[in-house]
């Protein structure tokens, strides 16, 4: 075919004109491009031949056109017709007229949206579907901006109580207000609370609460709680006698009543009474449940000749010495030596307990 074209004189004339103008029909493949690239890398530059640059520019400037499909130009469908109700049938058979009318009715709404999401008008380069989506987004953004402006204005009214006309005065809500009249400077009028007034009340209350919290913190800092526990007064001394004192004398009396810290860590009167009870339980001549007993375990002695605790007739007639004059039985009898040894061992054990408690108290004071 190329030979046949060359035989035509008109074709040869057009070809000569194009060659003389320098417009050559350029066609490159990957092999030609690689060879041109290698020539540039090796330093062999052909400044006269710029066909490669023009080819690259033409490739980059080529824009792919948007071509809609053929279905975008019509609303017909090739799907078979299925009757959806008994009214579309005539005596149980398919009526061709009803079929065509139903297809025509279903085609009308499709014609209205022909090219809705396919056609892009010249100069807009967007489909109708894309334009509608942009409009909906713009409406949503405008609504959000209006809401933010309203919220900011509302906050500014809350922060500035002067907008409500209440400076330095707290206005109660309308429900809590009594039928009173206040002078606002413009005349004697009754104040009625509005939503803005209630917001101003909340702002003033929050400021007052913050001031009260600062004052309470200052009071807590100025008050020394440790000083409350530095001076401990013995309750027994207060009950025995209270000496009224004023000025320096009263301070000296209070200082005398201060109990040292060592006494606080020592065994209490309850522990001493228990020790006394344990010690007196082993005495043969004392009753451990006797409240009037002043025996502290230091000068106690076993007296077998006389027992002053029992002064009744039965006690006088009974000979207590006869119990200890007998020899100890095989199953174990309490002799004076055994009682004294037991008493001494108990006293030593109690003193060791006191020392242990004092040692622990010293350790605790050292840790504190």
Swiss-Prot record:
GO terms for cellular component: anaphase-promoting complex; nucleus. InterPro entries: APC_su15/mnd2, Mnd2. Residues 149-162 have a biased composition (Basic and acidic residues). Pfam families: Apc15p (PF05841). The modification Phosphoserine is found at residue 293. One of its GO terms (molecular function) is ubiquitin ligase inhibitor activity. It comes from the Eukaryota. One of its GO terms (biological process) is regulation of mitotic metaphase/anaphase transition. Disulfide bonds: none annotated. Residues 140-167, 286-336 are annotated as: Disordered. Keywords: Cell cycle, Cell division, Mitosis, Phosphoprotein, Ubl conjugation pathway. Pathway: Protein modification; protein ubiquitination. Signal peptide: none annotated. Component of the anaphase promoting complex/cyclosome (APC/C), a cell cycle-regulated E3 ubiquitin-protein ligase complex that controls progression through mitosis and the G1 phase of the cell cycle. The APC/C is thought to confer substrate specificity and, in the presence of ubiquitin-conjugating E2 enzymes, it catalyzes the formation of protein-ubiquitin conjugates that are subsequently degraded by the 26S proteasome. The APC/C is composed of at least 13 subunits that stay tightly associated throughout the cell cycle: APC1, APC2, APC4, APC5, APC9, APC11, CDC16, CDC23, CDC26, CDC27, DOC1, MND2 and SWM1. MND2 interacts directly with APC1, APC5 and CDC23. Belongs to the APC15 family. This is Anaphase-promoting complex subunit MND2. It comes from Saccharomyces cerevisiae (strain ATCC 204508 / S288c) (Baker's yeast). The lineage of its organism: Eukaryota, Fungi, Dikarya, Ascomycota, Saccharomycotina. The gene is MND2.
């Amino acid at each position: 075919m190329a030979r046949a074209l060359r035989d035509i004189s008109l074709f040869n004339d057009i070809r000569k004109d194009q060659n003389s103008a320098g417009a050559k029909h350029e066609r490159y493949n990957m092999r030609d491009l690689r060879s041109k690239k290698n020539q540039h890398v090796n330093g062999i530059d052909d400044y006269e031949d710029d066909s490669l640059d023009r080819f690259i520019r033409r490739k980059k400037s080529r824009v792919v056109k948007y071509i809609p499909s053929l279905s975008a130009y019509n609303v017909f469908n090739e799907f078979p017709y299925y009757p959806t109700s008994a009214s579309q049938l005539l005596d149980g058979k398919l009526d061709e007229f009803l079929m065509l009318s139903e297809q025509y009715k279903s085609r009308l709404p499709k014609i209205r949206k022909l090219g809705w999401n396919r056609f892009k008008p010249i100069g807009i380069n967007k489909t109708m579907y894309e334009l509608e989506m942009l409009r909906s987004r713009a409406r949503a953004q405008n609504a959000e901006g209006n809401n933010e402006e309203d919220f900011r204005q509302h906050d500014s009214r809350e922060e500035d109580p002067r907008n409500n006309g209440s400076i330095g005065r707290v206005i109660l809500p309308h429900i809590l207000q009594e039928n009173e009249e206040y002078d606002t400077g413009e005349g004697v009028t009754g104040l009625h609370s509005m939503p803005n007034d209630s917001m101003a009340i909340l702002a003033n209350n929050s400021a007052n609460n913050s001031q009260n919290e600062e004052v309470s913190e200052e009071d807590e800092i100025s008050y020394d709680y440790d000083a409350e526990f530095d001076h401990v007064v013995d309750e027994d001394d207060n009950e025995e006698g209270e000496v009224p004192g004023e000025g320096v004398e009263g301070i000296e009396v209070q200082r005398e009543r201060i109990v040292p810290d060592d006494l606080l860590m020592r065994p209490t009167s309850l522990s001493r009474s228990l020790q006394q009870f344990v010690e007196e339980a082993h005495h043969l001549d004392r009753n451990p449940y006797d409240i009037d007993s002043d025996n502290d375990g230091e000068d106690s002695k076993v007296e077998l000749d006389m027992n002053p605790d029992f002064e009744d007739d039965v006690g006088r007639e009974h000979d207590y010495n006869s119990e200890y004059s007998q020899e100890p039985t095989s199953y174990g009898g309490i002799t004076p030596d055994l009682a004294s040894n037991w008493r001494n061992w108990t006293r030593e054990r109690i003193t060791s307990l006191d020392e242990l408690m004092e040692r622990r108290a010293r350790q605790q004071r050292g840790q504190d």
